[in-house]
From Swiss-Prot:
Native organism taxonomy: Eukaryota, Viridiplantae, Streptophyta, Embryophyta, Tracheophyta
Description of how the protein assembles with itself and partners: Interacts with RAD23. Interacts (via N-terminus) with TRAB1. Interacts with ABI5.
Organism: Oryza sativa subsp. japonica
Compositional bias per record (Low complexity), positions renumbered to this chain: 1-16, 64-85, 421-436, 505-514, 684-693, 713-727
Domain of life: Eukaryota
Biased composition (Basic residues): 410-420
Pfam families for the chain: B3
Major location (coarse): nucleus
UniProt region (Disordered), positions on chain: 1-38, 64-102, 248-282, 395-463, 476-527, 643-727
Protein name: B3 domain-containing protein VP1
SMART domains attached to this UniProt entry: B3
GO cellular component, one term: nucleus
Amino acid sequence: MDASAGSSAPHSHGNPGKQGGGGGGGGGRGKAPAAEIRGEAARDDVFFADDTFPLLPDFPCLSSPSSSTFSSSSSSNSSSAFTTAAGGGCGGEPSEPASAADGFGELADIDQLLDLASLSVPWEAEQPLFPDDVGMMIEDAMSGQPHQADDCTGDGDTKAVMEAAGGGDDAGDACMEGSDAPDDLPAFFMEWLTSNREYISADDLRSIRLRRSTIEAAAARLGGGRQGTMQLLKLILTWVQNHHLQKKRPRTAIDDGAASSDPQLPSPGANPGYEFPSGGQEMGSAAATSWMPYQAFTPPAAYGGDAMYPGAAGPFPFQQSCSKSSVVVSSQPFSPPTAAAAGDMHASGGGNMAWPQQFAPFPVSSTSSYTMPSVVPPPFTAGFPGQYSGGHAMCSPRLAGVEPSSTKEARKKRMARQRRLSCLQQQRSQQLNLSQIHISGHPQEPSPRAAHSAPVTPSSAGCRSWGIWPPAAQIIQNPLSNKPNPPPATSKQPKPSPEKPKPKPQAAATAGAESLQRSTASEKRQAKTDKNLRFLLQKVLKQSDVGSLGRIVLPKEAEVHLPELKTRDGVSIPMEDIGTSQVWNMRYRFWPNNKSRMYLLENTGDFVRSNELQEGDFIVIYSDIKSGKYLIRGVKVRRAAQEQGNSSGAVGKHKHGSPEKPGVSSNTKAAGAEDGTGGDDSAEAAAAAAAGKADGGGCKGKSPHGVRRSRQEAAAAASMSQMAVSI
């Protein structure tokens, strides 16, 4: 710290002719009369601290935030070591220890010192400024009777002041009545440094620079003599207490804590501007305008912002004041808050803040000791399976307004998300399916659709499975037996009427060889493709779907599973018919529908006619996992029930259980077991029988149309549940 005078142009608020050197390192320095100060500077002898203050190699050098505790711009007469005025120096201390590099203002001249001297609050209060009366100690040191205090809570500046006071006694002319400096004054500073070794080091003391002319001029402006010297000393020590140590310790603790806990996170600020708890006197001063409060942190409302003692129970263990006109002096300076008070602060919601080390109840809780919770939203939301949450909570308010409101953009993003989820579900389904196969030893397991897609309600074990694929048990047993398995429903196989089931075994016997070859080929193809097929969607056909328009309206989930459409014209998709292995060239497109889309599958007329699909039937679309091609299959669920409903004797047959119906079922099952041609017919008969049993008790009082409609609904419901279970 440099208090040199005469090194720059005069800078003062008031009487420039009488100002003393009270300026700090960053800005202008206070000046005594130029001629007097230059003359004094020319004949001053500067003594290094090494002459009176021994080196302390055993003390750890706690590096301060800047290269030196106070930035100094001294003249050539100044020394970077800790110096003491050789002669005629008042016991004043660099009252200008403000530096621009430390972020504080400076006491620009002696006029500001005089402003500090004219405080309304008396110096001698009930509680002294420091634990020991520094003024009495210095006065005793001047008179040759030093009193060693236990803790003089000043800084390196405090030591410089006090040693400068000793030097002034040695000189013994300008400011006070001369008396020799005591020999044990260096020992007193050694003991003081020992008691404060955690906060100050010998290097910090050696970085302080002091000029005798500045001390003399300042003391002279304060009245001269011992009284002026003591007043100057008190002002300097007060300034050091309220600014320098409060700045140095929090910053040092923050830097150390940030380096130890998380070096990637920056320090919360180079100028925190904390004020420690007030318990002593409050002095209005213009010197307090030199520092800026920490702007990055605003105390929450729960804190209250009240100044409290470190040990007091309260939500805010330190005071953060934005006052420009007060300097808070604590009766117990620089004492960190207790762990209980710091715990209250962290429990009140400040745990995410990076606090100085002394505020944390444990060493590990300084700066970012709490990990940030993951903000990634869950991939699914409750209520609708497969619906992806957009994660808008992560968007800032500014980005929320830019969120695409266009239906097209929103649809594209939604489709992309659902496609990604569909791929993930597919992979998980494959892994689970393979693991189940290895565990059970069976080559065939239910498809991913039944395990991971839309929830299904399993039907009773006694119901015959009429679904798209035969039950897994039949597929497993087919390679081990000579009996052919019933193949998938083919489009060209004639469907029996209710009156034809009796001659069915004879027809099956005549065409046994051909059916055997066809069913064997179907088995191999089915066993191969069933492992690779993934269910995409199904659609119950309406009258418009099977009419002359030649298009089928697809459900909404088509936009997820089928190729993405960018234009209304759509894309051409080759669809392989699972039953006939014929490839149909269909066109997948959409119609704009009230800010939404209606998806269509065109060029389906030939497919519907070849499979003899009518209203109430449904189609199922698959994708081949390996090849990526699409497969389609038509399933008929209404023929037997509808034709039986049209006949007048259908109600009686179902109600009384005529032998003809069981005969139909048994014959159909037998035919399916022998030549594999009656699989679908037997399934239809079983569905019709189930439908008849379900509503047989209530068919007597209904019209034929009502009976037919109820049976169709029952058959459709049973077929969809059976299909889901079998798949």
